[in-house]
Amino acid sequence: MKIAYLMRHDITKNDGVTKKVLDQTTEWKKSGHTVQVFCYVYNKGKSIIVDANQYKIRPPLKNKFVLENDLLKDLEVFSPDVVYYRYSTLNRTLRKVLSKYKVVTEVNTDDLGESKLLWEKERNLKSFARYFTYTLFRSQILKKVQGIIAVTKEIAELPSTTKYDKPTVYIPNGIDLEKYQTIKKQNEAYERVGLFFIGSPNQPWHGVDIIEEMSKKLPQYDFHIVGMEGDSSENLFWHGYLQKDEYLKILKKCQICIGTLALERKNMKEACPLKVREYLAYGYPTIIGYEDTAFLENDVDFILKLKGNKVSDEAIEKIGSFIELVKKMVVTSDLIQNIDIIELEKRRLSFIEDIFKN
């Protein structure tokens, strides 16, 4: 097949999303398919997706109503069998694409639910416009696609997804395990157990406040937070934003990692974040506050799933027991094959091929 990967994202930042797209398209090419990335960016620049076609995002109104003729011409020359669209908002160019090509869309979030929560919290014009836009245009996209791939079972089963009666499958995020070397050492000496978290500011569902509370109730352990600023204490250390080589130095001193702890604040129960896949690939048992899509069918002893977003005495007891149980454990690649991108992309390609043939 010839697959056009259409997306709107700043791929010049070479962030987790960019790495995911690179890994996906690399696997597709290995399977014998011809793939080209077509990407809207704010500023053109170098990217790890070196052969991507980049198109500068216009101001909001122009972006909505003016055709991106360069992109449409490039698509026509490429002549894809299927367009794989990383779901975003609707514009006039996308309308053209939806009317001309077979389109499979990848849905990564409950955008309606998230934008509604933001509007209820902020009550300003910007958040209302966002919610209104998603509500108005979502149906116009999903009505016209030929297939939907959600990253979680929860998203795949939302009424706002199922109401369009489209072929739908859920495939969680994965990573290329061959690119990761185990960092955690099984018998390495350490004075105190360290727990590691990395995230971004202003994301209340990360549950950083829960980590702060954990540090107070578990003073015998050290907690390291990367990606945001704060006031450090005797056992809670805020490191701010760090480049990868810098935060890996901190990770190497830790024994356990922490993922998102308060996903319920987004009215969601299930997720599959890339950072948790990286924790596991580096060998670290992990504490999370949600159901992970890749582990819905089986409980594993290297993941602790906390319920609720409050640090009760019962939760603290579970956390303490888990830490003592796994502090010397190393998660090996044979235990996490269900997050390996090779197997996940085989499933994705099978779904895309079914759409193409039908």
Language-model features, listed with the residues they occupy:
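Nucleotide-sugar-dependent
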Residues: 14-19, 202-206, 245, 249-250, ...
